[in-house]
């Protein structure tokens, strides 16, 4: 069964509060061009034809999600998120019917600039190891000690910066996350859970504009990238 012969489902963990953003609401609900970041992100997934539906993992006491028009879309399913990203993703995976037949794309709620071209590249990988978008490191990488002094310089030829989406067979990822959480491992993305289970996910070169809005200065950058994309689309019409 090829990746495209499987049902493609997106899971978006959106239960975080984004404390580094220093805003009065979670970062996924900040606005760019009249829409929340979450709406831009989910819109990019819903307009990608292979995606059957999108599962949003939302904080149980989230007061914002029901105000958004996207919740009325029949292709949106909402589940309660967990205390960590891994738990939120796992809750989303458990909501998938027939997971053995599903290829899941897990995507950050605060990455609104994802392109369909990058999604195409991910789906070209068809084995049980799965694949993630990532960028080869271009800066010199320093490893620090506990005093924030340099302990050594890493070989950047082997360093990649992980992005999302991260794409795996839903059933395999579900088992990997359950196992990692049971072992108390520090799981910061889905690939790390797969690695802990013995898999070796593929690295697919992504784009530098697929940024995660994390700090205040990122908001203006995401706004710029989305504006540029809109301008190109209007020019090509």
UniProtKB/Swiss-Prot annotation:
Its EC number is 2.7.7.60. It catalyses: 2-C-methyl-D-erythritol 4-phosphate + CTP + H(+) = 4-CDP-2-C-methyl-D-erythritol + diphosphate. The record marks 156, 212 as: Positions MEP for the nucleophilic attack. GO terms for biological process: isopentenyl diphosphate biosynthetic process, methylerythritol 4-phosphate pathway. The record marks 20, 27 as: Transition state stabilizer. Pathway: Isoprenoid biosynthesis; isopentenyl diphosphate biosynthesis via DXP pathway; isopentenyl diphosphate from 1-deoxy-D-xylulose 5-phosphate: step 2/6. One of its GO terms (molecular function) is 2-C-methyl-D-erythritol 4-phosphate cytidylyltransferase activity. Keywords: Isoprene biosynthesis, Nucleotidyltransferase, Transferase. InterPro entries: IspD, IspD/TarI, IspD/TarI_cytidylyltransf_bact, ISPD_synthase_CS, Nucleotide-diphossugar_trans. It is an enzyme of class 2 (transferase). It holds the Pfam family IspD. Gene3D superfamilies: Spore Coat Polysaccharide Biosynthesis Protein SpsA, Chain A (3.90.550.10). Belongs to the IspD/TarI cytidylyltransferase family. IspD subfamily. HAMAP family: IspD. Catalyzes the formation of 4-diphosphocytidyl-2-C-methyl-D-erythritol from CTP and 2-C-methyl-D-erythritol 4-phosphate (MEP). This is 2-C-methyl-D-erythritol 4-phosphate cytidylyltransferase. It comes from Actinobacillus succinogenes (strain ATCC 55618 / DSM 22257 / CCUG 43843 / 130Z). The gene is ispD.
């Amino acid at each position: 069964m090829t990746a495209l012969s499987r049902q493609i489902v997106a899971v978006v963990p959106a239960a975080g509060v984004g404390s580094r953003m220093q805003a009065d609401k979670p970062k996924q609900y900040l606005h760019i061009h009249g829409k929340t970041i979450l709406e831009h992100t989910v819109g990019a997934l819903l307009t990608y034809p292979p995606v059957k539906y999108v599962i949003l993992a939302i904080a149980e006491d989230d007061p914002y999600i029901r105000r958004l028009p996207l919740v009325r879309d029949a292709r949106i399913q909402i589940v309660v998120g967990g205390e960590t990203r891994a738990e939120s993703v796992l809750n989303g995976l458990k909501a998938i019917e027939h997971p053995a037949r599903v290829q899941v794309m897990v995507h950050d709620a605060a990455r609104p600039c994802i392109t369909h071209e990058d999604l195409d590249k991910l789906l070209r990988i068809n084995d049980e190891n799965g694949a993630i978008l990532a960028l080869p490191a271009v800066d010199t990488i320093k490893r620090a000690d506990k005093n924030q002094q340099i302990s050594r310089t890493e070989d950047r030829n082997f360093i990649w910066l992980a992005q999302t989406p991260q794409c795996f067979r839903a059933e395999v990822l579900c088992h990997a996350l359950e196992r990692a959480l049971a072992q108390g491992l520090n799981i910061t993305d889905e690939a790390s859970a797969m690695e802990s289970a013995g898999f070796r996910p593929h690295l697919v070169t992504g784009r530098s504009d697929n940024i995660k809005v994390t700090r205040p200065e990122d908001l203006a950058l995401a706004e710029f990238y989305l504006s540029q994309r809109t301008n190109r689309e209007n020019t090509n019409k």
